[in-house]
From Swiss-Prot:
Protein name: Sec-independent protein translocase protein TatA
Family annotation (HAMAP family): TatA_E
Molecular-function annotations in GO: protein transmembrane transporter activity
Function: Part of the twin-arginine translocation (Tat) system that transports large folded proteins containing a characteristic twin-arginine motif in their signal peptide across membranes. TatA could form the protein-conducting channel of the Tat system.
Gene designation: tatA
Amino acid sequence: MGGISIWNLVIIVLLVVLLFGTKKLRGLGSDLGESIKGFKKAMNDDKAKDAEFEKVEQKTAESTEQKAKEKEQA
């Protein structure tokens, strides 16, 4: 009694379609999809940059250690 039944959801969906129309809803859906794709692409680009930064940081640390060892030997 206190919950939302399937018929209540059907009526709500029909009202939304009548108010906004299918063109606006279709446009809204495609805009939302493009936004999600852009967000995922940005996250993947960020991961690639982080991995590249870690490689550079590791090389720098190795060269610093190597220079320190050379100074100790000299």
